């Protein structure tokens, strides 16, 4: 896992040079949004279960996927879906705090699409639920933090699509 600081420093280090203006501006932007990120993470942490619950209600609960024969039918499959969505929310929050999506590749996306396909998990419905979670989260944390979190939800959605 990297953060925005490590990413900028490593890039300059590999090139054997001091931080240039563009690198310093990137760091300045990261630090300027630090308080916003921490407030958003605090709100998300305090409301994680409600965020997942509302996202499921908005995107999956009343669709064919939860009816007999659907991929979320049976309590075990439903619980696995909730667990996965909570996992995506948590790791998106980590990525938002770090200002870098690398943790999403390392801990979420590597091999996930293949695993879902082999288990018959509907990727489209998963992406729909992630997008619903993006909307619910933005409504709680406000437009600026919501936009920032949206980057990481979209990153996961794109990685699954």
From Swiss-Prot:
Keyword Metal-binding: no
Gene Ontology cellular component annotations, sorted alphabetically: phycobilisome; plasma membrane-derived thylakoid membrane
SUPFAM superfamilies: Globin-like
Binding site for (2R,3E)-phycocyanobilin: 81
Swiss-Prot/TrEMBL keywords: Antenna complex, Bile pigment, Chromophore, Electron transport, Membrane, Methylation, Photosynthesis, Phycobilisome, Thylakoid, Transport
UniProt PTM comment: Contains one covalently linked phycocyanobilin chromophore.
Domain of life: Bacteria
Subunit structure: Heterodimer of an alpha and a beta chain.
Annotated family: Belongs to the phycobiliprotein family.
Function: Light-harvesting photosynthetic bile pigment-protein from the phycobiliprotein complex. Allophycocyanin has a maximum absorption at approximately 650 nanometers.
Name of the molecule in the record: Allophycocyanin beta chain
Encoding gene per record: apcB
């Amino acid at each position: 896992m990297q953060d925005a600081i490590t990413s900028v420093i490593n890039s300059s280090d590999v090139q054997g040079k001091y931080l240039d203006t563009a690198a310093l501006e990137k760091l300045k932007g990261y630090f300027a949004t630090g308080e916003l990120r921490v407030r958003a993470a605090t709100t998300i942490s305090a409301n994680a279960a409600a965020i997942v619950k509302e996202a499921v209600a908005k995107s999956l609960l009343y669709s064919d996927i939860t009816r007999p024969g659907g991929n979320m039918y049976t309590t075990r499959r439903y619980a696995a879906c909730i667990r996965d969505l909570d996992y995506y929310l948590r790791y998106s929050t980590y990525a938002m705090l770090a200002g870098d999506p690398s943790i999403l590749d390392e801990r979420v996306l590597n091999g996930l699409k293949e695993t879902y396909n082999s288990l018959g998990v509907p990727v489209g419905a998963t992406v729909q639920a992630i997008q619903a979670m993006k909307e619910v989260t933005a409504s709680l944390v406000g437009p600026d933090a919501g936009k920032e979190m949206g980057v990481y939800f979209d990153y996961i959605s794109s990685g699954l699509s």
